[in-house]
Every structure is written in structure tokens, then in C-alpha cells.
Amino acid sequence: MKVSKVYTTIDAHVAGEPLRIITGGVPEIKGDTQLERRAYCMEHLDHLREVLMYEPRGHHGMYGCIITPPASAHADFGVLFMHNEGWSTMCGHGIIAVITVGIETGMFEVTGEKQNFIIDSPAGEVIAYAKYNGSEVESVSFENVPSFVYKKDVPIIIDDYEFQVDIAFGGAFYAVVDSKEFGLKVDFKDLSAIQMWGGKIKHYIESKMEVKHPLEEGLKGIYGVIFSDEPKGEDATLRNVTIFADGQVDRSPCGTGTSARIATLFEKDALQKGEIFVHECITDGKFEGEVLSVTAVDTYEAVVPKVTGHAFITGFHQFVVDPRDDLKRGFLLG
């Protein structure tokens, strides 16, 4: 056996959505900001993403993270997230998992009953709070970047279907649509059709308009499509599944998607400041969300959302790359 690379990871999940935190084997990542570091990874470290996200070490739905030194003077650390298509700008379930793993493995030092962390992400500064009992994390909440409705009631015509979507930012840009527009339910049996529609809607919007953040050139494009449905659980407000990247299915309620959904509900006067919004996902897991404050992003009215969930560690791994392996860079099916 020959080994050219060794990577260590800690894996976790949030409502079924995986996060693989890469703890060893990562070279120096250059850049003064997280957006610059993300761009560096896209140009120089995409092989690492392919090796650890793709089969045979990962799968089509795998999500990953690298914890970096802080980019700003007052932050505790930075994060860079990756998936089956590339490098994302922010990931809410990833924040929940990173804080949980960091505390439960002793990576992060905590004192008192609650601990907050200031985190640099490519989308901006995120503040996370952990509620824990000894070494066990009970839940993690995070105050996300200002989230806003970019365009509402955008008309879409695809395959003789006419419907409208709202486009909102919650750390990334999402199109929000009701699943009933297609006669579908947010359930396993309709998932293939939902994936198909997610890809079509994303490509349609990006062919018709440029979606970009008014203050940050590096934040642009439709990241995912949120399909909204009536909840199954009596304690839930809405049910959803998010299709993002290259047809990837978010098993969790989607942290940045929940933030975008909070912005759309607030815009429609369907959610008030301080009111709890319970977002249910396709695995029946739930996030709690609320509007903490109202602010502005350029000319857009925005909200600062808070999202709460919990994560569980699933394993500690050591992956190797054999230079003789024709599939050493990985592959994707599905």
C-alpha cells in the first residue's frame, strides 16, 4: 500500500444532514477574509473537497467544513463550507454541528452554563450560543447575517407550469416556492420530482436574472430552492425540503434556508419579531427560528434571524489516498 495523503475528520449530523469537519491534512489557506479564503480553496484546494465529499469516502449528499483561524480581530475562528458542487458562503446546520463537535471533543474551551462564539464566515459574522450540560451539548443557536427578501412574487414559466417564487437571502440566496404548485408533498415518495423541479427552477432564474448581494460582490447566484409544505407535526409551523448545489438534498430544515424563510414570512407580516417559527424537514427534524431585530442591507429591509437546533457526532475517521488508485479523486452517482 502506498499513501500520498492522509486526512482526519470528525463527522456529525443535524436532523440527518451530515457535516464532515476536516481536522487534519489541510494545507495553509491563504487570504485575509473568509471570502478570499473561499476563493483560494476554489482555485487551489478543490481536490480536497472532491476526495472527502465524493464517493467512495463520501456521497452525493455529503457536506464538509474546514475550521480556520479568525479573519477578524474579535472573532474566535472562521469556517469554510463545501458540498458536492463547490464551496458555499454559509451553512446554518454546519454552525450547529461545528459548535457541538468543538465543545464535546474539547476543541473549544467553554465556561459557565452558556457560551457564545463569534464566527467569521464568507457571508459575514455569525454569533453562536451553546446550551450544554457538562460535556454534552443540548442545543446550539446562532444569530445569522442580516437576511432579506431580494425579489418577491417572481413569475416562473416552466413546462406549461406558471407559478411565483420569492427570492431571499439568508447567508446564501434561495428561491422559495410551495410544493403544492406541482401537486407534491415534502415526503420521501415525491423527492425525485422535487429534485427535478429544484434544478429547473434554479437554472430558469439564473438564465433570466443576475442575483447578487447589494454590498458584497462575492455573494451571488441561486444556491438552493426551498419547497414549502404544511407541517406533519402539531408543533411545527411549516415543513420544507431544500434542493441546493448540484441537486443535493438538505436532510435538515436548512439553517440559512430557515433564515431566508424567516425573512419572507416577516415581509408578508406572517411572522412577528420574537415569535417562534418551527421549521420541519423531510426527516421530521425541526429548527426553531425567530426575528431578533430589524435592520437594513443597502436599500432592503432586513432581519437578524436566530436559528436553534442540535447535532450528534457520528464518527472519527482517518482517510487515505493511494496514488495508484484510478478513483483517488472520487466520483459521484445520483
From Swiss-Prot:
Annotated keywords: Lyase
Entry keyword annotation includes Mitochondrion: no
Molecular function terms from GO: 4-hydroxyproline epimerase activity; trans-L-3-hydroxyproline dehydratase activity
InterPro entries assigned: Pro_racemase_fam
Keyword flag Aminoacyl-tRNA synthetase: no
Reaction equations catalysed: trans-3-hydroxy-L-proline = 1-pyrroline-2-carboxylate + H2O
EC number: 4.2.1.77
Catalytic residue list: 91
Similarity annotation: Belongs to the proline racemase family.
PANTHER family reported in the protein's UniProt record: TRANS-3-HYDROXY-L-PROLINE DEHYDRATASE
Protein name listed in UniProt: Trans-3-hydroxy-L-proline dehydratase
Organism expressing this protein natively: Bacillus thuringiensis subsp. konkukian (strain 97-27)
